[in-house]
Amino acid sequence: MQTLNRRDFPGRSHPDKIIQFGEGNFLRAFVDWQIDLLNEHTDLNAGIVVIRPIDTDFPPSLSTQDGLYTAVIRGLNEQGEAVRESRLIRSVNREINIYRQFDDYLALARDANIRFMFSNTTEAGIAWNEADQFSDAPPSSFPAKLTRLLFERFEHFDGAADKGWVLLPCELIDYNGEALRELVLRYASHWQLPAAFTHWLTENNTFCSTLVDRIVTGYPRDEVAALQTELGYQDSFLDTAEYFYLFVIQGPQGLAQELRLDQLDLNVRIVDDIKPYKERKVAILNGAHTALVPVAYLSGLDTVGQTMDDAQISRFVEKTITEEIVPVLDLPEDELLSFSQAVLSRFRNPFIQHQLLSIALNGMTKFRTRILPQLLTYQQQKGQLPPRLTFALAALIAFYRGEREGQTYPLQDDAHWLERYSTLWNGVKHGDIALAELVNRVLSDANHWGQDLTAVPQLANQVTEQLQTILSRGMRAAVAAYS
């Protein structure tokens, strides 16, 4: 069976226009996949040069396959039908190992055609390293590497205003574009680079903050043989992802024309502020995940897919989203409901097996960041507590007993919470404290919640009553009132 290469698998090729820091699965099934679609259906005509930002030879270079690889997209489409699409991605031209090919890396700065930069160097990638020097070949941090490249471009083109870049970091941190911009400017100052360079950076380069959303499941180890037989070639860089994707870019509206988004209807939004979209994702997608985990797991289910196949629990999830989360979010209702339906479809994806216990990791912090804001806003706006969100909190407290149908299961959270719950539940078990006292001690932890939640009218009472019902009647009977 042949291995992918451009000689044996000829097709479209495109001039270098994009630099991409990061060779991992996510960008290849997200950015590179979208650029490939734009190359096919518009006149974008943009090739990608991938920069490996860390000093490692594993995995092998994409250049061993001339940049070619297959993206397998699978999930439920807008009609709820299971679909699978295999696409040979031709948008990547080659990969450069910056630690072995530093001169080739700097040469990219001197290419007048380069216009865009994408990156995903993980959440830890956009960071400062005091030890990085301009003379390092290369510096260690990603922002320092980028600063060095930008200065090379500034010098080569004598600070030409039309040679700046559009920079679109995809790292999962808030306002990633602003964070990257600040660090690049900090390196420019730290290295005492000319003031004219700083002016060129701020006036002629556009740092865009982004929000990225797609579950990328990566290399399908257990299915590789079958997939390669079906495709008819060997592909060491096979990449799999869900059907849904969303790319929100905080940037100038002209970017839509530059990326040819006006010629192809991709799920990309150019907006003035990504904050509402971040809040929507955290509240609906992540919030629903966090709300369903303890309810579903204590109902005897083990995966998100099983949860959505269970009529009772799936109704609880849907009503939680549409009746208690969506009404308090600050975006048009039709957009929120459309996103909610997409989330529910993603939860039903038969190609992804999300274990509830893995999602349960750090559940206390997740509840605080993903659900509590909506719970409190609902109470303030409507003068009453959202019953399903408080039930999710009661279920979470019950979950930290660590017991389902007489069997224990592993709990993964901050040691402080694991120790506290162990002590509290033992106290209830031996009759040393009442259930209401357990709830009060959990809710009154202002260091965790940011406030004493026992001060929220009726919250402690409602959670205690719901928790008592869960313990006395079982989760199935308790959740029936909210399904």
Swiss-Prot record:
GO terms for molecular function: mannitol-1-phosphate 5-dehydrogenase activity; tagaturonate reductase activity. Disulfide bonds: none annotated. It is an enzyme of class 1 (oxidoreductase). It holds the Pfam family Mannitol_dh_C. GO terms for cellular component: cytosol. Its EC number is 1.1.1.58. GO terms for biological process: D-galacturonate catabolic process; mannitol catabolic process. It catalyses: D-altronate + NAD(+) = keto-D-tagaturonate + NADH + H(+). NAD(+) binds at residues 18-29. It comes from the Bacteria. Keywords: NAD, Oxidoreductase. Pathway: Carbohydrate metabolism; pentose and glucuronate interconversion. The keyword Oxidoreductase applies. Belongs to the mannitol dehydrogenase family. UxaB subfamily. This is Altronate oxidoreductase.
